[in-house]
Amino acid sequence: MINLQEQISLFKIIGSQLKNKVECIAIGGSAMMFYGAKNATKDVDMVFSKKEDLEDVKNILYKSGFDERNNIKGIFREDETAGKPTMMDGKDTRFDLFLNEVIGFQIHKDTIERIKEVHDFGNFTVKTASPEDILMMKACTERERDRDDAAELVRKFNIDWNAVINESSKQTKIGIAAFPVLLYDFLTELRENFNVDIPKNITKELLLIAEKRLEELKKQDKLIKVTKYK
């Protein structure tokens, strides 16, 4: 685990060693610490838009004592092609470096437009994803601590639920087709098990979006039948 000041120190090291300007988006606990919504985090999660930028940061972490984890245990809901991170293990924390998507959640211009803060560390610019985007990304994982983080996000911030609904609809076309169902299950769990105030009209709307997308895929004959054998 590292706290905000320790994270800032690591970002300063990266910025001082980069030869060119590199930008990324902080998500998860890393972004939540910048927002003051979390005191410490186990993972520093970052999304890059360029492969070469990710590799530059990865190489600096390697030279700073981090090792790449080759055997990534699945935290993926949909399939093994969902945006896997490059994981760099350190003594007190782990960097998860994503490229353009987070476990199937696609990063695009609307995600960037919703960014709330920008932190400059020399050649390293770290932008913080919006609380709405952090919440939606956490719906794509199966880690229990992500439920705790998501509950804190909803309690601390005035979530723009219209943005969540609009993004959920968009993700069905550019990311995971079943994303509204994942988010519905996730938010329902937060409401029932974490006593979080999730508007019922929002979860209802998510199901309607999912049903609409399912009908579209049926008409286009793009549904895939999956049979599981035990």
List each language-model region with its residue ranges:
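Compositionally biased terminal segments of proteins
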Residues: 1-230
